[in-house]
Amino acid sequence: VLFDRGLVAPGVDAGYVDSENAFGGKAFPGTVGQYNPGSQPFLKVNRHGERFMNESQEYDNASHASFQQPGHVYAMIHDANFREDVDRFHTIGCSALTRYIPGMMEGQLEQYEGEGLIMKADTIEELADKMGFTGADKDNFVATVARYNELYDKQNDEDFGKPASRLSAIRTAPFYGCWLGASLL
């Protein structure tokens, strides 16, 4: 099964590729580990700063959607209220571990921030810079976050149909972002 929680270093491509050196002839270059919170339905955008899917879907569907994006990666964005959001999302299966294991997400945020895999910023613009968005892609990113906040306020995802209970505001600093790609579990 392809999972949607492979943590990827900024600027690195990921995805399912042929590799004669890997078991079964396939590999997932770029992913550096499983980041369980990556399966939470937070805002996800491509390298152009554009939202491209309903983030509240099965693991493999999110992975397959990423294969159509530049570098086969996407950024996941959330704010300081992630704990309340995760509790409200009430995901099931192994993604629920983020909710059930006390301190899991907080510990992983701290660990991976220290390794340069999760970015933390006081503003959305600063987060965009840290994540590598520049020029029009940065403008798109900032506009996408603003649009996502509008959808949250309406409690209606007019763009991709995500259930209202899975929407979250991105307004309270610090803001967090990381790059994800498909990984084999």
Task: List PLM regions with ranges.
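An anion/pyrophosphate-binding glycine-rich loop and adjacent beta-alpha core
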Residues: 4, 8-136
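A glycine-rich dinucleotide-binding beta-alpha-beta segment and adjacent secondary-structure elements
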Residues: 139-185
